[in-house]
Design a protein with these regions (language model features):
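FAD-dinucleotide binding site
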Residues: 1-538
Length: 538
């Protein structure tokens, strides 16, 4: 696994100059993913010197995890920079020479084809037959036409019909089925193929949304997610390079790895502190006056804080918010955590000695003909493999070798995570043989897969607006505590960042980065006069 070097302490680092420490607010950042690192970097750059980062795992990066797999760098987590101009991740990568030169043709990545730059997606049935390219294109046009309609409910304020149950999946399935069924030019066999392809497209869409099913995704809110124009870029050296750039000026003493947090105590009064005289303050130094917040770690260590920036994933907050915060979160914030959605999207990488696919093939899409009329794409445990929607060919082979990347989401992804490598490799090989009709496909040389759902410090891949939730819930999740600006309650004791707290860019790396910068800027604004005064004195 690639590791990130944190800069060693030196006389010119942000902690050794600038504002005098004894005036500094104590800031604890929980989590060293993109949001936490962006918040920390922004705080240090703006003169804050008493910043501590607590990361539960043994590495930085969060849901960015680049793995060296032979000569190839594979992404278990974040893969693409979505869009160009206006995307801070893109500009960071471009300014630091992380992106390769690409042609216009190479940059035209389709919405459904997840990985490849060139070539053709092969839609294969479970009978081992390839669906003709013209039929695939015909269906794709129909699906994309309906997809555009799903955006209009939010963007144009279009009312949602009760029959859709405010569900992207139900709306899409019903309308596409209706259009297919009423088409007078198609034979019954063609209609069945298209209906089967619809189910496959919905599986892919679920992987992209990180939802167990598109039936769970809110139709009225779907169009609020904002796409930045431009291509989807892959970083050849690994997305971890972005993590390293964010972390390179963070001194090593700021960052504590392997430091899971047990509880965040906020609105901590002087009376509370009287009984805690034996609790040591392990921040870099102590600011005069009581600390309104205290962070209690699993190993028994405590950190006093004026401000705590929480970047835990929505999955972790769903699992632990009732015990993680003392006092408990306000009811409306807890309700927003409950209403918003997060599921698991996992990747399965298979390495082969030689390609069994043709040179123009950029992906193998699994179309189950017996699923044409299913209303639900949830499966019993023994059929978890049916949720694998496709295998994409990693491109170019000079970089990746002969590598396929499979996609699976929802509860079936969690079931996959529980299986051993041998079982998953065998099942994937059988699927590839079945759908290509080639019984001579060998087992892969090696397998690598993600396990975001069962990772106790992540618990899912990324968030979505579930039926019953809205952008307002994202705003409530992001709102700092305490809510009231009372003179008796110190402000901004607990701040919230992470992709799930960005109303327009949830589920993205740029949303995560921007959310961290947003919370840092709240503190910069709060201490504007102090920072200016101390900078003038320096």
């Amino acid at each position: 696994m690639q590791s990130c070097e944190i800069s060693s302490d030196s006389t010119d680092d942000p902690l050794s100059s600038g504002l005098r420490r004894h005036h500094q607010p104590r800031i604890v950042v929980i989590g060293a993913g993109l949001a936490g690192l962006a918040a920390t970097q922004t705080l240090l750059e703006n003169g804050f010197t008493n910043v501590t980062v607590l990361e539960a795992s043994d590495r930085i990066g969060g849901r960015v995890q680049s793995i060296q797999f032979g000569k190839a760098t594979l992404e278990l987590g974040a893969t693409w920079i979505h869009g160009a101009n206006g995307n801070p991740i893109y500009h960071l990568a471009e300014d630091n020479g992380l992106l390769e030169h690409t042609t216009e043709d190479e940059r035209s990545v389709g919405r459904i084809s997840l990985y490849a730059k060139n070539g053709v997606a092969h839609y294969q049935t479970n009978g081992g037959k390839r669906i003709p390219k013209d039929l695939v294109e015909e269906f794709s046009d129909l699906y994309n036409e309906v997809y555009e309609l799903t955006q209009e409910f939010f963007q144009n304020g279009k009312p949602v019909g009760a029959e859709t149950k405010n569900s992207v999946g139900i709306f899409t399935r019903d309308l596409v089925r209706k259009k297919i069924t009423l088409d007078p030019d198609d034979s019954e066999s063609t209609k069945k193929l298209k209906l089967s392809m619809l189910q496959q497209y919905l599986k892919v869409e679920s992987c992209e949304s990180s939802s167990a099913s598109m039936d769970e995704v809110s139709l009225s809110e779907f169009g609020e997610w904002t796409e930045i124009p431009g291509a989807h870029h892959v970083i050849p050296g690994g997305f971890v390079k972005v993590v390293e750039l964010l972390a390179q000026d963070i001194p090593s003493r700021v960052l504590h790895l392997g430091k899971p947090v047990r509880r965040i105590h906020w609105n901590y009064s002087a009376q509370d502190a009287e009984g805690d005289a034996d609790q040591a303050d392990h921040n870099q130094d102590q600011r005069p006056g009581p600390a309104p917040a205290r962070v209690e770690c699993e190993d028994g260590e405590w950190f006093l804080a004026d401000h705590v920036v929480v970047t835990a994933s929505l999955g972790v907050l769903k699992k632990a918010h009732e015990t993680l915060f003392s006092p408990s979160l306000p009811l409306d914030k807890a309700l927003s955590i409950q209403k918003l959605g997060i599921s698991t999207t996992d990747k399965i990488f298979l390495e082969f000695s030689e390609p069994f696919w043709s040179p123009e093939c950029n992906s193998i899409q699994f179309v189950w003909e017996d699923e044409a009329h299913l209303e639900s794409l949830a499966y019993p445990e023994e059929l978890w493999y049916r949720k694998i929607c496709s295998f994409d060919v990693l491109y170019p082979p000079e970089r990746y070798g002969h590598m396929l990347s499979g996609w699976i989401c929802g509860d079936e992804a969690l079931l996959m995570e529980r299986c051993d490598d041998e079982t998953v490799a065998e099942m994937c090989t059988e699927l590839l043989r079945k759908f290509t009709g080639n019984q001579n496909i060998p087992k892969p040389r090696r397998i690598l897969r993600s396990s975001w759902g069962s990772n106790p410090y992540i618990r899912g891949s990324y968030s979505f607006t579930r039926v019953g939730s809205s952008g307002g819930d994202v705003e409530r999740l992001a709102e700092p505590l305490p809510y009231t600006k009372s003179s008796k309650a110190p402000p901004l004791q607990v701040l919230f960042a992470g992709e799930a707290t960005h109303r327009k860019y949830y589920s993205t790396t740029h949303g995560a980065l921007l959310s961290g910068q947003r919370e840092a800027n709240r503190l910069i604004e709060l201490y504007h006069d102090l920072l200016n005064a101390e900078t003038t004195k320096a």
